[in-house]
């Protein structure tokens, strides 16, 4: 739980560093838009190292958690329709781990087959 709080704090600090008061992201009109309008600024998980990981993270967070014009108390928050980010990350990590496990098992099978063919060929 403590690491999760640190990660959240780090992300918040990165967002604050990227946003400037003269930027349009601080205006109520931009907050009311509620989406990132420029398609070039959309986060694409297939494209890596295009402008750095921090920029991609900030763009993803800007899409998922747009700024609201008024601050609402915690009990009156609007319910989000899209799934939480942690589920997306969990499934991404699961797919990656399954792919790594599949690759490793293929290597082990290839090594076992090589040993068998070497012993039969002698």
From Swiss-Prot:
GO biological process, one term: positive regulation of DNA replication
Record has Signal as a keyword: yes
InterPro entries for the chain: Corticotropin-releasing_fac_CS, CRF, Urocortin_CRF
Residues recorded with modification Valine amide: 120
Cellular component, GO annotation: axon; axon terminus; dendrite; extracellular region; neuronal cell body; perikaryon; varicosity
Gene3D superfamilies with a match to the protein in the record: 6.10.250.1920
Keyword Zinc: no
Coiled-coil intervals: none
Chief place where the protein resides: secreted
Propeptide: 26-80
PROSITE patterns: CRF (PS00511)
Subcellular localization(s) per the UniProt record: Secreted
UniProt similarity note: Belongs to the sauvagine/corticotropin-releasing factor/urotensin I family.
Protein name in the entry: Urocortin
Organism: Rattus norvegicus
């Amino acid at each position: 739980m403590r690491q999760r709080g640190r990660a959240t704090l780090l992300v918040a600090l990165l967002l604050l560093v990227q946003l400037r008061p003269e930027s349009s992201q601080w205006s109520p009109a931009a907050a009311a838009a509620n989406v990132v309008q420029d398609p070039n600024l959309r986060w694409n998980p297939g494209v890596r190292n295009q402008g750095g990981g921090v920029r991609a993270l900030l763009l993803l967070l800007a899409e998922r958690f747009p700024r609201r014009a008024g601050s609402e108390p915690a009990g009156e928050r609007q319910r989000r329709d899209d799934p939480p980010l942690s589920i997306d990350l969990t499934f991404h990590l699961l797919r990656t781990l399954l792919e790594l496990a599949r690759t490793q098992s293929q290597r082990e099978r290839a090594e076992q087959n090589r040993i068998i063919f070497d012993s039969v060929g002698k």
